[in-house]
C-alpha cells in the first residue's frame, strides 16, 4: 500500500470522518498561509518560497519557514458526501476557490457521477475535469456538461474538459500495471521515513458529525493543527 511514503502528511485515510476532518484542516491551513502572504505582501506560494530561500524574512523575530505544496487526493467522493455532505462540499469549494495561491491542490474522483455527489457548487469550482467511460449520457453531463463519455471504449480512453478549451478533448491514458506501481512505491519508501501529522485526522469534527454525536470540536487542537 501507499502508507509509508515519505511525502505523506498523514497515513492513507479510509474513515470518512477522518477524511472530512483532514479537509477542514486543509481549509484552516490554506487560510493560515494566505494570512502569512498578506502580512508579508506576497501573492502566491512560489513567490513566498523564493523570498524565504533568499533570506528576505530573516529580520522577523520568528522567521516563517518554507511552505510545502500539498495535494489532496479523494479517491471516492460519494463516501464522504454520504457521511458529511455539506461540510465536505464547503471544504472542497473553499480549497478549489483559493487553494492554488496557497499551494494546496485537489484531485477528486468518483465512480458515482450523480448530481448529489458532484454537486453544482463543486462543478462550478472544479473546472478541469476528466471523464472515463460511463453508463449513460446523463452521467457524462454531470462530469463534463455534455454527452460523449458514454461512448468511450474504456482502458484509459477519456475526455478531458478544460475551462478555456471550449470543448473536451479525447485523450488516451497510459497503462501502468500493479507490479510497476508497487515497484515505484517501494523504491520511494526506501528513500526516507514519513513524518506523519496524525492530529490532522482529529483536529476538527465536521458540524454534521458533531451534532450526530461523533467527536466534538476541539478549538485547541484545531489551532495547533492550523499552525503546522
Task: Give each language-model segment a name.
Residues 21-228:
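P-loop NTPase motor-domain active sites and their immediate coupling elements
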Amino acid at each position: 500500500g501507499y502508507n509509508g511514503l515519505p511525502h505523506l502528511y498523514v497515513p492513507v485515510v479510509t474513515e470518512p470522518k477522518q477524511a472530512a476532518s483532514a479537509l477542514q484542516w486543509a481549509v484552516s491551513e490554506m487560510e493560515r498561509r494566505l494570512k502569512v502572504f498578506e502580512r508579508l505582501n506576497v501573492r502566491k506560494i512560489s513567490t513566498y518560497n523564493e523570498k524565504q530561500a533568499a533570506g528576505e524574512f530573516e529580520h522577523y523575530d520568528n522567521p516563517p519557514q518554507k511552505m510545502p505544496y500539498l495535494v489532496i487526493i479523494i479517491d471516492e467522493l460519494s463516501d464522504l458526501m454520504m457521511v458529511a455532505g455539506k461540510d465536505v462540499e464547503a471544504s472542497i469549494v473553499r480549497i478549489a476557490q483559493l487553494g492554488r495561491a496557497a499551494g494546496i491542490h485537489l484531485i477528486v474522483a468518483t465512480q458515482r457521477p450523480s448530481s448529489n455527489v458532484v454537486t453544482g457548487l463543486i462543478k462550478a469550482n472544479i473546472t478541469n475535469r476528466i471523464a472515463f467511460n460511463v453508463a449513460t449520457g446523463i452521467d457524462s453531463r454531470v462530469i463534463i456538461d455534455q454527452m460523449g463519455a458514454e461512448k468511450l471504449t474504456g482502458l484509459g480512453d477519456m475526455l478531458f474538459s478544460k475551462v478555456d478549451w471550449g470543448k473536451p478533448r479525447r485523450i488516451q491514458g497510459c497503462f501502468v500495471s500493479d507490479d510497476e506501481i508497487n515497484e515505484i512505491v517501494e523504491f520511494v519508501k526506501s528513500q526516507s521515513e514519513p513524518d506523519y501529522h496524525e492530529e490532522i485526522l482529529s483536529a476538527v469534527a465536521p458540524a454534521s458529525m458533531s451534532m450526530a454525536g461523533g467527536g466534538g470540536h476541539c478549538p485547541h487542537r484545531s489551532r495547533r493543527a492550523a499552525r503546522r
